[in-house]
């Protein structure tokens, strides 16, 4: 489990995350939702130690984040940021192999190669593994980055807006893959997501943020309801039950 205690981050004296406390369940998909500027990505970055914490603590498996050695943490937790700009031209296989760096520092062992092969197969990329990233569609490229995270083989997988710039078909594909990571491989997935209907259909737990604070957190029924969503987003919602999913209608 990941526990967040009174986490705060400020820029120029203004809090973008303020006194956030959470318990993120293990072996589940947890989605951070909320309007722009709610502090979702900042919170995710602090949990992953990419961003300095101004106040508060994060505990991973009851061990305070600052006490984890970098090598240990990179085998426990991985993060895929929203922007992944790589200046060298890589094939899919070369990218996925980077996921094994915490274990082999670039000198791949038979065990590392096995993990790379399994990640490529899992993401259905084996047949195009030697293609270059700049030759791929948006959906293929995102699958390649997720394969890299799978190869890293961490218990906790953090993703910052993994559906960014993807069409509906590829967004559904990615969310189904994340669901499989939890259900088949036992991973704990934490993601920032803007589309609340994807959050509703694929998450186990949702954290609603606004102005750097947690408005509410809980299971689907506790968050995907009219009063809570209207408080988070300050707009009108209708909730429809469609094929056992709660679908938010907010276009009118």
Place the predicted regions along the sequence by residue.
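Conserved ABC ATPase "signature" region
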Residues: 97, 110-128, 153, 158
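Conserved ABC ATPase signature
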Residues: 132-136, 140
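Conserved ABC transporter NBD signature motif
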Residues: 56-64, 73
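Helix-to-loop junction immediately C-terminal to a conserved catalytic motif
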Residues: 48
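The feature captures the beta-strand-to-loop junction immediately N-terminal to the Walker
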Residues: 33-35
């Amino acid at each position: 489990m990941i526990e967040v205690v009174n986490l705060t981050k400020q820029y120029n004296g203004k809090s973008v995350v303020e006194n956030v406390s959470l318990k993120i369940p293990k072996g589940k998909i947890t989605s951070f939702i909320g309007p722009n500027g709610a502090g979702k990505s900042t919170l995710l970055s602090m949990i992953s130690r990419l961003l300095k914490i101004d106040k508060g603590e994060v505990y991973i498996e009851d061990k305070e984040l600052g006490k984890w050695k970098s090598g240990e943490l990179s085998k426990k937790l991985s993060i895929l940021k929203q922007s992944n700009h790589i200046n060298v031209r890589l094939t899919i296989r070369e990218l996925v192999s980077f996921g094994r760096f915490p274990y082999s520092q670039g000198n791949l062992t038979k065990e590392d190669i096995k993990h790379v092969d399994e990640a490529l197969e899992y993401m259905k990329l084996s047949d195009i593994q030697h293609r270059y990233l700049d030759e791929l569609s948006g959906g293929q490229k995102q699958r390649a980055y997720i394969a890299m995270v799978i190869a890293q083989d961490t218990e906790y997988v953090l993703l910052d807006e993994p559906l960014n710039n993807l069409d509906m078909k590829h967004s559904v594909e990615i969310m189904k893959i994340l669901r499989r990571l939890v259900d088949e491989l036992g991973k704990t997935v934490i993601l920032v997501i803007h589309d609340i209907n994807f959050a509703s259909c694929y998450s186990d737990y949702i954290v609603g943020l606004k102005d750097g604070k947690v408005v509410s957190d809980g299971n689907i029924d506790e968050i995907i309801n009219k009063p809570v969503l209207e408080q988070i987003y300050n707009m009108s919602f209708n909730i429809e039950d469609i094929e056992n999913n709660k679908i938010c209608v907010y276009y009118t």
